[in-house]
Each structure stands twice: as C-alpha cells, then as structure tokens.
C-alpha cells in the first residue's frame, strides 16, 4: 500500500481470503437469527419486527465480519426494499444523504494532499524543526499526525505516510524491530492516527456521526464548533501521548547524530515547491479556512468539501486526474451510505423508538446531572464499541438512539452526540479500527502494547472530557 492509495482505504479492515471460525459462525447466525426474529411472536407491528430481522443480519455480519462490510450493508438495504419493509427511496436513502458525500469529498482532499507531495513535505518540515533527540522526534511525529488530520482526513492514510518516515528513523537510530524506539514511534503514530479524527470533523466515523446528529437530532453540526469543542483535549492528548510513550517505552538511546541532515536530505530530494503542491496547498487552505469559519457564514461542511474536491478534478485548476478517480476505493463511501440508510429505516418502521426505550431503560435512573450523563455515556459507548468493531457501524447504529433519547428527555442532542462520538476513539484492540490493524501489521509493536497505551489514553481523555463538558463547552454555547 502506498501513500497515494492510502486515502482510499478509510477505516475498513481489508477482506481476508481465509475465513476464521468466528466469521463462519457469523455467516450461520446471519441466516438463523433474522429468520427467528422474522417469525417470532413478538408484540410488535409486522413492519417493525421485519425491520429488526434485517437489522440483525446487518449487525451480526458487521460484528463477525461474515462478509465485507459494504457488501453486508448492500444486502441489508436490498432486503429492506425487496421484502417490502420500506420503499426503495427509504431503503437506499443514505446514498442521497450528505454524509456519504462528505466522506467522498474528504477522501478526494486527502488524495490531493498525498499525491501532490504536500503531506510529505509538511511532515518533513515539521520534523526538521523539532530537533534530533528521540523525545523531540517522537513529539514531532505526534504533532505532525494531528496537523495532517486537517489535510488528510483518513487516519489510515496518515499512518501510511508517517510509517514511511518512522521506518527511516528506526534505521537512522539503528534500532531493532522490537526495541523501545521502534515500538514507541509506531505505536503512538498508529493510536493517535485513530483518535485525532474524532477531535476534528474529518474521519469517516466523525462524519457518519455528524450526519446522524443532523438527521435524527435536527441540529446543525458545524465544523468549527466541533474543532473548538475538542481543541483542549487535542492539546492534552498530544502531550499525554508523548509523555506516556516515553514513560512506558524509554529509548535505548536519546540522540540521533544526523537527524537534521536526514530531514534536510529528504526535503532536498523533493526539490522546490512544485506546481501541484502549490495548487494543493491553496485548495486545502481554502477548505480549512471555510470550515473553521462556518459558524460565521454557515456554508455546510459537505458543500465546502465537495466544492474543493471537485475543483481538484478540474483541468488546469486541480491536481487530480481520471486515473486518480479510478484508484479511489469507494467501499467506505458505500458503507457510510448503508449505515445512514439503516438508521432511516429504523426511524420509518418505528424501530428507533423501541430500541431507545430498551437500551436506555437501565441507565436512565443514573442520568441525573451533567457529570453522570457524561461519565455513563462515555463508558457505555466505550463498551458498545467492543461489539461493533467498525466505528461507522458503531456510530451509525447508536447515534440515532442517542439523538432520540436527547430529544424525548429535553437534553441537548449536540452535547450528547459529541460525547458519544468522542468515546468511539477509545480502543484497546486492533480489530476495533482499520487504522489500528494497518499500524499493527507493520510488526513493530504487539497487541499487549496497544492495550497498555489504549487503556491509559482512554482514561486520560475521560478525565479531560469530564472537565470540558460542564465547564468549557458552555462557553461555546453547548449547554
């Protein structure tokens, strides 16, 4: 996989040729469980019950990876229509929703940054100025990861870009594959690649959540408000991830004698700014400027992203061509559209009301104030993510429930939606994110390392969130 191809990947695990016993069991359950629900004597309207049967197929397929994620979603949407649960325009409504198109446009912008060389130049420039000691290089990797999130929305793409730099640095340090130096760099660039796109409205998961919040919460989700809501947490995460890695994996050596020379050499190889890089910088700069100021002009983030993405395809103005469009992996876009469609079907069949009542019944007595609401939603979402490995399916199936609960109980849908989405960033196992799977596949750290770092950062971010929600968010109008 190359950096050019990376943005097309999004956060979906690659399909495997040899199915695990777990996946085989999932394929069996995908048939038996929906049939059992379809013909069960549940006290529900037929349309609601049949919708749940197909929903069970989709969720089981996503949990067990019985088939490729997007294929499972396509089958589910088709069954909603073919079996008469809802009409075609509802079963496939997600494909006309702005959420999927936002992701498509974000992937185009990421492709602009990577194919033009802009992302790599930015990475080398930052690394050149942070210093040549291991602690400074590690901090530079984390800061670069965060800044790249603005121009390369795909966490997978950022991991691929930074991994190529980290491998060269590992060689420069003459560090072995299992050394603390190599382990620390790859572990933290992988994990932060997974969480930064929850703090910025950039990755597929955050985009899916924002679309569901708009649809089911009836609210306007602004890119700038999202950025500033999590900006303090972003800063804390950068520093906490840096110090945590140095503490858990102290380097065998501190300095890199030719660190500055290495980055200067790489920048020299790239030469002066090319026309493509200049165009890419202008296009991405326009997108970021419009996103950050959307609280003023109220141009939807999707409109900005799609406008810039299409401009990048225009002759003479853009930097992408027909071949770039052909290389783009559209499966993540389809997957998001299918997750949105599923939520719309739940609403149309009244299944959303049933699920909200069941899911929130046992936690409702404890949701008494802003502190308990924040804590319970955070940890419930964290645990729920163990069941639905994909962030898109996790957020696509749960955000509608959170929005419905917020509206029926007089709570702020934006506040609850941001808390729930942010909690999706906390992970312990590679299977929970395609980004983690790709980082883990390089072989520089082990599964237990991911658990250690993930557990610490999940707790740290929870503490920060408990301070932001009641004290900082009201300053932004999020009460």
Language-model regions, residue ranges each:
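Lipid-exposed faces of alpha-helical membrane segments in multi-pass integral membrane proteins
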Residues: 29-36, 53-60, 75, 79, ...
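Interfacial loop-to-helix junctions that mark the boundaries of transmembrane helices
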Residues: 16-22, 42-50, 61-62, 66, ...
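Membrane-embedded alpha-helical segments and adjacent helix-loop junctions characteristic
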Residues: 15-19, 57, 70-71, 75-176, ...
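Hydrophobic alpha-helical transmembrane segments in multi-pass integral membrane proteins
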Residues: 200, 289-290, 339-357, 414, ...
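Juxtamembrane and boundary regions of transmembrane helices in multi-pass small-molecule transporters
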Residues: 2-35, 155-158, 174-183, 187-209, ...
């Amino acid at each position: 996989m190359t950096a050019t191809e990376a943005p097309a990947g999004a956060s979906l695990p690659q399909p495997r040729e040899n199915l695990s016993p777990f996946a085989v069991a999932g394929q069996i359950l995908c048939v038996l469980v929906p049939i059992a629900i379809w013909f069960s004597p549940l006290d529900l309207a037929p349309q609601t019950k049949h919708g749940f049967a197909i929903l069970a197929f989709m969720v089981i397929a996503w949990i067990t990876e019985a088939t490729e994620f997007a294929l499972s979603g396509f089958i589910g949407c088709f069954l909603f229509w073919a079996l008469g649960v809802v009409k075609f325009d509802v079963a496939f409504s997600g494909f006309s929703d702005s959420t999927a198109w936002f992701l498509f446009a974000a992937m185009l912008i990421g492709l602009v940054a990577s194919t033009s060389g802009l992302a790599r130049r930015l990475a080398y420039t930052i690394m050149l100025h942070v210093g040549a000691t291991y602690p400074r290089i590690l901090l530079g990797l984390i800061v670069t990861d965060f800044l790249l999130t603005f121009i390369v929305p795909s966490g997978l793409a950022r991991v691929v870009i930074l991994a190529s730099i980290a491998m060269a640095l590992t060689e420069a340090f003459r560090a072995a594959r299992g050394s603390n130096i190599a382990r620390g760099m790859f572990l933290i660039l992988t994990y932060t690649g997974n969480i930064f796109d929850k703090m910025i409205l950039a990755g597929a998961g955050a985009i899916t959540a924002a679309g569901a919040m708009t649809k089911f919460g009836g609210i306007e989700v602004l890119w700038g408000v999202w950025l500033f809501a999590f900006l303090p947490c972003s800063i804390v995460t950068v520093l906490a991830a840096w110090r945590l890695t140095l503490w858990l994996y102290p380097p065998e050596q501190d300095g890199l004698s030719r660190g500055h020379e290495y980055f200067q050499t790489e920048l020299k190889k790239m030469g002066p700014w090319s026309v493509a890089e200049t165009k890419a910088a202008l296009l991405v700069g326009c997108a970021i400027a419009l996103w950050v100021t959307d609280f003023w002009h109220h141009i939807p983030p999707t409109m900005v992203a799609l406008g810039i993405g299409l401009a990048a395809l225009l002759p003479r103005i853009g930097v992408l061509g027909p071949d770039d469009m052909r290389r783009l992996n559209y499966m993540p876009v389809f997957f998001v559209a299918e997750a949105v469609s599923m939520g719309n079907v739940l609403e149309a069949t009244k299944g959303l009301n049933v699920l909200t009542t069941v899911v929130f019944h046992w936690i409702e007595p404890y949701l008494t104030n802003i502190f308990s609401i924040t804590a319970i939603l955070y940890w419930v979402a964290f645990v729920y993510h163990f069941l639905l490995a994909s962030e898109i399916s996790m957020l696509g199936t749960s955000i509608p429930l959170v929005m419905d609960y917020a509206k029926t109980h007089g709570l702020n849908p934006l506040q609850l939606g941001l808390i729930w989405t942010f909690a999706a960033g906390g992970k312990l196992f590679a299977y929970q994110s395609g980004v983690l799977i790709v980082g883990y596949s390089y072989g520089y750290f082990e599964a237990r390392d991911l658990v250690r770092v993930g557990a610490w950062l999940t707790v740290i971010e929870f503490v920060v969130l408990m301070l932001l929600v009641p004290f900082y968010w009201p300053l932004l109008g999020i009460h």
